[in-house]
Amino acid sequence: MPLSRLEILAILFGVAAGCATRFSIAGEPAAGQLHVGWATVDITPSARVVLDGSGYKRVTSEVEDPVTATVLALETRDGDRVIEQAIMISFDLVRMTKEVQDGLQLEAAKRLKDFDSSKLFCGATHTHCGPSISYERTGPGQLYDLSNETDVMTPQQYILLLYERVGAGIAEAWQSRKPAGMSWGLGHAAVGYNRRLSYTDGSAIMGFDTARPDFSHIEGSEDQAVEMLFFWDSGQKLTGLLLNIACPSQVGRKAISADFWHPIREGIKAKYGPQLHIFAQCAAAGDQCPEPIVRSRAEKAMTERRKISWKQELANRVVRAVDDVWPCAQADVQTRPVFAHRTIKMDIPNKNSYNEARWMPSMVPVEVHVLRLGDVAMATNPFELFLDYGIQIKGRSKAVLTFISQLTCDSQGYLPTRRAVAGGDYSAVNHTVGPTGGRVLVDESVKAINSMWP
């Protein structure tokens, strides 16, 4: 497919036309003694709340399983000199907002005098059964209209609960950091499935109808890797692990739930210790879902034979992947890794960015965090990012293993590929940033990652 006029302009103008990026790197990042702290915070509300993530209103106090926020504090030091810092937080929520992240950065600044609060960032697992933090959607006439509801915790009230509980968790994680080691691992589990179907006329839908006679193919690819970071104390006892999966957690329907992440956590803790912290991270997965499109009836029959739920089946697959990787990770622990953390402010072209008067694109401001930890890189973005973009970043990265964390720092909606836009339908038409902006996001993320390696 030929490039559009705007894409050609973005390439020609480079950063000037496509992205204003502000960060600096002074030489190769330094290695230092790693210090790690953890906290896991229960963010399950005790009142009725509106759940976010569906096209209809769901108000409930029913709890299928708890929703949590997991706080991971990282620091490297050379003696008493601090080299680098980060606090990252994973939420069992459908989205993250700039308001919530800004509020938690303020909480960190109030509570911690030896931490740069700009190096705190928050991401969401994209559970469709988490309490809403989008109060602009709950007014009269809006999708989640609460104007006639009584005894409901509003999103504004729930955000205050997050500030209080997670603020305390931030302090707990930071103040408990101790000398530690880290290792990475790579396993595999079939969790995410591409959910966009293409038909012979060139159209596409986000759905499950493969029985149509004009069904042609699944539009995009799938990534069945389970990327892992293990963290160990000074006695080489595991304290927690970060799991990165290219799939939103949206099996559940009506009750408060962390979705498949809950049985993943419980399964790992049952094998390796109840004290473990499990940090859930969703990779680029805007066109993915945890339900199989092809062989769906056979998959359902197999879970019925096993007498387990589908989310338990997904969790079992992930736990088996951890089991497989565990011995390799335990044998390669680093206590003095290279650690670098950059906060990047990007201005990315929006989907209607061609301006006839100025011949320049209008921009969407985006915050991205890029980290190097040993051989591993991590790059965040605030989108429901289609998988292809994540694969592009991973493929071009100098890191041995590259983690992508979507819906982090904010929520800017879907970022579809050019082929998805051509096919149309939900997720490919309701977006702020399109393929031109996706190209800029990839290029700038790769540039930031690769600048951390010689």
Give the residues covered by each predicted segment.
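Bacterial N-terminal signal peptides
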Residues: 7-22
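Short, intrinsically disordered low-complexity segments
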Residues: 4, 21, 194-195
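N-terminal export leaders
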Residues: 5-8, 393
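Conserved beta-alpha junction segments in alpha/beta enzyme cores
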Residues: 27-277, 281-284, 288-302, 306-313, ...
